[in-house]
């Protein structure tokens, strides 16, 4: 008899085979990290079923099996090998295997050229990811499949990890998106992650097997893979057991089953993990800590004692917080609970309950803040809206007038506010990753079977907190599970996670030069700081005592109530907040639709309320609301796009069509190459600028998921050109850019410079004999060398092109480029002058040339101009700064063309009080790790605020809107909170 055990990251599978390979017994269960106990239970069940079985050939496989085999002296079979053996034995002729496990994902390419691709320590796009998303949608995991079957639309969602996806899904939930559509979107995200992250450009075709729990139990997930791959995969019988059966097929050594329990118990008793000092040495130390933090408090009252009040609502990423405040600042009533994916229901229930219980207490005015601000304000007629950073500032300043630093850690957001002379001096916000936030702890608490409150209390008694570093949630999943296998208690894991949250906040977001740089009067707030472990860890790490208000979790709502009171005092009026009768007639319906008014094809969520009031979300311009085209007269991004669209086309080409992929440096050099190629007798056809399907066209050929999104798009651009039947494609490698004088050198970044090589290596059609892909190395620094290189390049396919033709074409190209450059600067100056005449703030939306691509920037430019600001790009102002003088002040080597413009733009903004810089940074851009710090330094040393927005393929602008509004509010530009 042969026995195989597959101990995965979340489940354990056993397969018992007879000598002929027939399956006699099998089981599939979750182990909740209690691996030794689960094996013992399976052993007992096996002995009951086969009472005469004393020994068998036994082997163990799976990511959780190595520790067991090492400690018990058993045979270990690598899971890829086990799966390969089983697939080849049971399903001959299989070309590829796709398996999704709890935290593991793999693709096996079988046949002559065997290859295995596995995820590393990131568990994005696996079963654990789907579990997290189900929890976020407040449904059981099996219900995800039922929901997806009823979907009508799909949204773009990241599946890199659970917390990134929360950042995408939560705003959609708060805007009223249907759970059915979100479930389908999650499955598509998982399929996309597996294909781009694992296949890395290798085509998946032929006979494909789907294995593992998620693909077995969820037909819609299989459909998503079929759709993306354009195949029809097969989920075979016993698909959950392939690794276990493969291990059984490979079992070589006979094992005495009667002594196995003793070995397992001995192994389970071992403890070996890295740990930190305890948060509290004894109970007395904790008592002193609690007493100190009970001093800072808001006075508490009841609605029964007040005839008038103000209400603040904080519709956060994962929770709803409500504060009712008396005119003298007492907290009369409060509400704090998970929004369970539907903030509208939570607010309606609270208001109905409040009006019913306290009919004598009149609400004078209300304000709402947070992710769900727009939805709640429209639905319930809330008087005012306020960006959450300002709401938290007002609350902290009310409690501690001398506050100079505020740290707020919420469900998914981290806000750090530097205060100087009673006003916000600087703002730090976490990026799209929310690993150091409350949802991070909540996720682990739920995985381990506790509420967040229970988990926090347990951590207080930890004697050896596990040292987990400061990594993201799914990266840390593996560390936590390993610590459990090494004997760490839940208390030590809870304390260790609390410490890791603090380290993430300090060293990934705030990054202070010293503890003195943070301040002396520090207020910490947000629901996460209600956890005494997190608060203690912060104080220990910084060696500082801080202030935690008694309403730390309600500060956003309390600040909103204070703001409502301030606005009401300035202009008393009858509140527009729905009354009890109106709440009784309250109706809320949600419908998804696609906007067809432009090429963006935005997925709109239309919320309809009683009386026909509508709130539309998901739009990236005002056209679905106003039915008028956006006005872009003060938007240089759109004007640059228009200049590119208006480039002349050679309609009488003597040499046919030349295709250009419209991405990366082509957004700057298209005028140059268009003039050159047109002069040589080609009609230039570039791939579309605003086609949202471009990414999907090339998705299967992307070799690395870590490269920036603009580079990933290039695969789709090439595919589009090939689909049009274009046989000439021009996309040269370019180490150097045009020399703008003054910088140490004029390099392109490695991705911009050499990505044509990547495309040639991964898109097989480019190697067809009928396709001419011109990707030679060219430089624009020396005209003579350029002429020579162009002649050599074109000689392969067009030997009739003469040197004289090329020389004239190069001259025409430089003329066209410098003309385009002059037009950009002139238009930029016109926008600046007009903005100053109209007293509008000016935003320099600084990035790289390709950031004007609407697919890349997701119309952030229009979001800014819709708020009432004028917008120019970095190249419109960078020439105003003398680069050689700037170089002396820089702390980095200024040798990259794009970087030089960013530094010059930051310097220019620092010198002009009516200008504000927002830097666009693409995820995965290593170069911008340098530029971001240097631009921040250049601005902050002159007392200016630096704002950064990270962008990739996710087009929900909720977080970006908060950053932009925070900048405008902190700079006191205008009352952006009431727009």
What are these model-predicted stretches?
Residues 1-20, 94-111, 300-332, 403-420, ...:
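Gly/Thr-rich phosphate-binding beta-strand-loop-beta motif of the actin/hexokinase/Hsp70
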Residues 4-44, 115-116, 120, 313-345, ...:
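Short glycine-rich, Thr/Ser-proximal phosphate-binding strand/loop in the N-terminal lobe
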Residues 34-35, 112-153, 240-243, 249-253, ...:
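Glycine-rich phosphate-binding loop plus the immediately following alpha-helix
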Residues 64, 199-228, 239-243, 369-372, ...:
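Glycine-rich phosphate-binding loops at beta-strand->alpha-helix junctions
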Residues 76-80, 226-245, 383-390, 539-558, ...:
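Conserved phosphate-binding/catalytic loops in two-lobed NTP-binding clefts
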Residues 119, 123-130, 433-441, 448, ...:
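An N-terminal assembly and electron-transfer interface module characteristic of large anaerobic redox
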Residues 127-132, 237-271, 394, 438-443, ...:
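Glycine-rich phosphate-binding/hydrolytic loop that grips phosphoryl groups
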Residues 182-206, 247, 290-299, 496-519, ...:
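Phosphate/ATP-binding catalytic cores across multiple sugar-kinase/actin-like superfamilies
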């Amino acid at each position: 008899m042969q026995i195989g055990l597959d101990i995965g990251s979340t489940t354990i599978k056993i397969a018992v085979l007879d000598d002929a390979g027939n399956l006699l017994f099998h089981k599939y269960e979750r182990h909740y990290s209690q691996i030794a106990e689960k094996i013992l239970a399976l052993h007992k069940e096996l002995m009951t079923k086969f009472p005469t079985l004393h020994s068998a050939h036994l082997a163990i496989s799976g990511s959780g099996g190595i520790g067991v085999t090492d400690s018990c002296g058993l045979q270990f079979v690598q899971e890829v090998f086990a799966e390969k053996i089983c697939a080849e034995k049971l399903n001959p002729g299989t070309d590829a295997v796709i398996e999704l496990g709890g935290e593991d994902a793999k693709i096996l390419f079988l046949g002559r050229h065997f290859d295995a691709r596995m995820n590393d320590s990131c568990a994005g796009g696996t079963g654990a990811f789907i579990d997290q998303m189900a929890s976020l949608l407040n449904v059981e995991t099996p219900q995800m499949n039922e929901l997806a079957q009823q979907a009508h639309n799909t949204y773009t969602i990241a599946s890199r990890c659970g917390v990134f996806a929360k950042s995408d899904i939560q705003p959609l939930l708060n805007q009223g998106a249907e759970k059915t559509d979100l479930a389908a979107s999650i499955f598509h995200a998982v399929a996309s992650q597996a294909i781009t992250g694992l296949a890395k450009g290798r085509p998946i075709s032929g006979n494909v097997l789907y294995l593992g729990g998620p693909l077995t139990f969820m037909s819609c997930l299989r459909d998503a893979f079929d759709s993306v791959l354009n195949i029809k995969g097969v989920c075979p019988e016993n698909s959950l057991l392939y690794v276990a059966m493969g291990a059984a097929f490979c079992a070589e050594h006979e094992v005495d089953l009667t002594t196995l329990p003793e070995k397992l118990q001995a192994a389970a008793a071992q403890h070996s993990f890295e740990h930190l000092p305890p948060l509290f040495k004894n109970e007395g130390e904790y008592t002193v800590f609690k007493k100190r933090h009970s001093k800072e408090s808001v006075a508490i009252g009841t609605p029964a004692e007040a005839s008038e009040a103000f209400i603040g609502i904080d519709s956060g990423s994962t929770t709803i917080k409500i504060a009712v405040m008396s005119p003298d600042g007492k907290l009369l009533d409060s509400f704090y609970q998970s929004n369970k994916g539907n903030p509208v229901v939570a607010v309606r229930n609270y208001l109905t309950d409040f009006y019913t219980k306290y009919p004598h207490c009149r609400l004078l005015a209300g304000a709402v803040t947070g992710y769900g601000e727009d939805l709640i304000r429209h639905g319930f007629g809330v008087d005012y809206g306020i960006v959450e950073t300002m709401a938290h500032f007002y609350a902290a300043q009310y409690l501690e007038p001398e506050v100079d630093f505020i740290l707020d850690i919420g469900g998914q957001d981290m806000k750090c506010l530097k205060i100087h002379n009673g006003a916000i001096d600087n703002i730090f916000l976490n990026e799209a990753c929310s690993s150091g936030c409350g949802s991070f702890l909540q996720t682990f608490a739920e995985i381990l079977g506790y509420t967040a409150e229970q988990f926090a209390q347990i951590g207080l008694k930890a004697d050896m907190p596990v040292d987990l570093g400061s990594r993201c949630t799914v990266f840390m999943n593996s560390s936590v599970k390993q610590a459990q296998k090494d004997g760490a208690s839940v208390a030590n894991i809870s304390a260790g996670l609390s410490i890791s949250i603090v380290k993430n906040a300090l060293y990934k977001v705030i990054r202070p030069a010293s503890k003195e740089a943070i301040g002396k009067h520090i207020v910490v707030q947000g629901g996460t700081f209600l956890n005494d472990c997190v608060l203690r860890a912060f104080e220990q790490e910084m060696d500082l005592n801080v202030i935690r208000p008694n309403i730390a979790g309600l500060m956003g709502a309390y600040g909103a109530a204070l703001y409502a009171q301030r606005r009401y005092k300035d202009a008393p009026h009858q509140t527009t907040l729905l009354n009890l009768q109106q709440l009784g007639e309250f109706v809320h319906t949600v419908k998804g639709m696609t906007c067809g008014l432009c090429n963006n094809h935005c997925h709109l969520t239309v919320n309809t309320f009683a009386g026909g009031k509508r709130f539309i979300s998901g739009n990236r311009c005002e056209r679905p609301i106003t039915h008028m085209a956006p006005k872009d007269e003060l938007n240089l991004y759109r004007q640059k796009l228009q200049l590119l669209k208006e480039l002349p086309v050679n309609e009488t080409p003597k040499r046919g069509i030349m295709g250009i992929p419209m991405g990366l440096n082509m957004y700057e050099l298209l005028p140059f190459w268009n003039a050159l190629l047109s002069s040589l007798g080609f009609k230039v056809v570039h791939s579309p600028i605003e086609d949202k399907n471009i990414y999907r066209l090339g998705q299967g050929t992307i070799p690395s998921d870590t490269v920036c999104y603009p580079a990933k798009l290039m695969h789709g651009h090439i595919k589009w050109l090939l689909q049009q039947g274009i046989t000439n494609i021009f996309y040269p490698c370019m180490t150097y850019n045009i020399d703008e004088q003054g910088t140490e050198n004029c390099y392109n970044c490695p991705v911009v410079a050499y990505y044509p090589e990547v495309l040639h290596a991964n898109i097989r059609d480019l190697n067809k004999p009928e396709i001419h892909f011109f990707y030679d190395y060219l430089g624009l620094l020396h005209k003579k060398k350029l002429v020579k290189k162009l002649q050599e390049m074109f000689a392969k396919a067009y030997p009739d092109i003469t040197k004289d033709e090329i020389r004239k074409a190069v001259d025409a190209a430089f003329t066209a480029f410098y003309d385009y450059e002059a037009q950009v600067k002139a238009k930029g100056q016109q926008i600046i002058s007009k903005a100053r005449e109209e007293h509008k703030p000016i935003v320099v939306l600084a990035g790289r040339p390709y950031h004007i691509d609407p697919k890349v920037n997701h119309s952030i430019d229009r979001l800014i101009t819709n708020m009432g600001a004028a917008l120019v790009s970095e190249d419109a102002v960078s020439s105003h700064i003398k680069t050689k003088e700037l170089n002396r002040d820089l702390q980095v080597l200024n040798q990259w063309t794009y970087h030089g413009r960013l530094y010059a733009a930051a310097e220019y903004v620092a010198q002009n009080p009516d200008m504000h810089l927002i830097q666009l940074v693409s995820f995965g851009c290593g170069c911008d790790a340098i530029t971001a710090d240097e631009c921040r330094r250049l601005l902050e040393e002159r007392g200016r605020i630096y704002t950064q927005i990270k962008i990739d393929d996710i087009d929900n602008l909720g977080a970006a809107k908060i950053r932009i509004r925070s900048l405008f509010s902190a700079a006191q530009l205008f009352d952006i909170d009431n727009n």
